[in-house]
Amino acid sequence: MTAFSLADLDRIVRSRAAASPDQSYTAKLVAAGPAKPAKKLGEEAVEAAIAAVQGDRAGLVSEAADVLYHLLVVLVGSGVALEDVMAELERRTAQGGLAEKASRGRP
């Protein structure tokens, strides 16, 4: 297992988002507004799902990395801290899966 973490990627994305859009793909995505990085996130998620269905392990690893990167770009562009997402995951995992899902009050 690598020592590289989601928090490490978050720091990199935040740093690159603060750069000039002329010099950073991340900054260019963030500067384009929320629709562009959200669209990329959706595209990468679909590609990851396709790789999973096809049993393409290497493709799934690659696409999952793209999903995580683009999710962090969306979070940064939306002003949402990774820590907030992690706190929500921690809250949810404190209960069993079905009990947690029922507590959300969604249909």
Swiss-Prot record:
Keywords: Amino-acid biosynthesis, ATP-binding, Cytoplasm, Histidine biosynthesis, Hydrolase, Nucleotide-binding. Coiled coil: none annotated. It catalyses: 1-(5-phospho-beta-D-ribosyl)-ATP + H2O = 1-(5-phospho-beta-D-ribosyl)-5'-AMP + diphosphate + H(+). Gene3D superfamilies: MazG-like (1.10.287.1080). It is found in: Cytoplasm. One of its GO terms (biological process) is L-histidine biosynthetic process. Pfam families: PRA-PH (PF01503). Its EC number is 3.6.1.31. PANTHER family: HISTIDINE BIOSYNTHESIS BIFUNCTIONAL PROTEIN (PTHR42945), HISTIDINE BIOSYNTHESIS BIFUNCTIONAL PROTEIN HIS7 (PTHR42945:SF1). Belongs to the PRA-PH family. This is Phosphoribosyl-ATP pyrophosphatase. It comes from Methylobacterium sp. (strain 4-46). The lineage of its organism: Bacteria, Pseudomonadati, Pseudomonadota, Alphaproteobacteria, Hyphomicrobiales. The gene is hisE.
